[in-house]
UniProtKB/Swiss-Prot annotation:
Signal peptide: none annotated. It comes from the Archaea. This is Probable tRNA pseudouridine synthase B. Belongs to the pseudouridine synthase TruB family. Type 2 subfamily. Could be responsible for synthesis of pseudouridine from uracil-55 in the psi GC loop of transfer RNAs. The gene is truB. The active site is at D71 (nucleophile). One of its GO terms (molecular function) is RNA binding. It comes from Pyrobaculum aerophilum (strain ATCC 51768 / DSM 7523 / JCM 9630 / CIP 104966 / NBRC 100827 / IM2).
């Protein structure tokens, strides 16, 4: 999957003061690790929780969290946020997924009929989580964006599926078998993409261990900075709003983003969409939810644009200019 293509709308021409904050590339190695994301190629066998714990141990950090659980027998793309980065994992919570599944049919299947059934399953479907599930087993709707037959060899088929978050691939295979009248079960599953993070950029546990060892023993963090992505990458798929220096600390303290605090933003986005708030140096401040659409923001001179849901930037990284303004207004009153 490719990230959405968006245009940048400039609201105020603004510069940023070099005295506070820093571009992500200028963080020290220790800071870089604390504010990082790894796109892991999870092997078959361990659970998602286990591999996240191993990453935490390798990097010597207190926290590591994964987005989108993979069952032990499933391999593939598993985004893991490191340390402070776990605060904004929700940015990936509802991201689309792409899987490649190996299905075994319990009887002979005509290829044309199989392709027709795959076409029928595209769109909104009803699903009930399987018996062995961590969530409540109630009927729910999920969107299937595409189902493509990559290969059919006898009773085995390789199927690529692009689905909404929370869709059970195993259940789709089972239901396809039922519609075909022969029955089917899933023999193997690999996740090849989460949103626009693909297996092409995924790294292994050994890659992480080697990169950390080279930095610790030889002082070279080049490999480590390739293996770990800056936490800003967790918002790669989200519309971005760049915030003026004067508004950054208010957001760090949980305040909503108001129109006067915006320098520029990506369009389009709609009311209710997740948005990522950045400094003019390219640092991720946090993740919020749009209170108005981007077309309305273009015309706004005041009013609230987004509520702040999660903050990753440390308070005090930028000066509390909002406090000075509030105090000045209080004194003048």
């Amino acid at each position: 999957m490719k990230c959405p293509s968006r245009e940048v709308f400039s609201k105020f021409e603004e510069s940023t003061n070099p005295q506070w904050g820093k571009p992500p590339s200028q963080r020290s190695t220790e800071e870089y690790i604390k504010y990082s994301l790894v796109i892991l190629d999870k092997p078959r066998g361990p659970s998602s929780h286990e591999v996240a714990a191993w990453v935490k141990k390798i990097l010597g950090v207190e926290r590591a969290g994964h987005a989108g659980t993979l069952d032990p027998k499933v391999s593939g793309v598993l985004p893991i946020a490191i340390a402070e980065g776990t605060k904004v994992l929700m940015a990936l919570s509802r991201s689309d997924k792409v899987y490649v599944a190996v299905a075994k049919f319990h009887g002979d299947v005509d290829e044309d009929k199989l392709r027709a059934v795959l076409q029928e399953f595209q769109g909104v479907i009803y699903q009930k989580p399987p018996l062995r599930s961590a969530v409540k087993r109630q009927l729910r709707t999920r969107r299937v964006y595409s189902l493509d037959l990559l290969e059919l060899d006898g009773r085995y088929a390789v199927i690529k599926m692009h689905v909404e978050a929370g869709t059970y691939a195993r259940k789709i295979i089972h239901d396809i078998g039922e519609v075909l009248g022969v029955g089917a079960n899933m023999r193997e599953l690999r996740r090849i993409a989460v949103s626009c993070y693909t297996e092409d950029e995924a790294v292994t546990l050994q890659d992480i261990a080697d990169a950390y060892y080279i930095w610790k023993h030889y002082g070279d963090d080049t490999y480590l900075r390739r293996v770990l992505l800056p936490i800003e990458e967790i918002a790669r798929h989200l519309p971005k709003i760049w915030v003026r220096d004067s508004a950054v600390d208010a957001i760090c303290n949980g305040a909503p983003l108001a129109a006067p605090g915006i320098s520029k933003f990506e369009t389009p986005f709609s009311k209710g969409d997740l948005v990522a708030m950045f400094t003019l140096k390219g640092e991720l401040i946090g993740i919020g939810r749009a209170l108005v659409g981007s077309e309305e923001v273009k015309k706004m001179e005041r009013g609230l644009v987004a509520r702040t849901d999660r903050v990753v930037m440390r308070r005090g990284t930028y000066p509390a200019m909002w406090k000075r303004k509030a105090k000045s207004q209080s004194d003048s009153a």
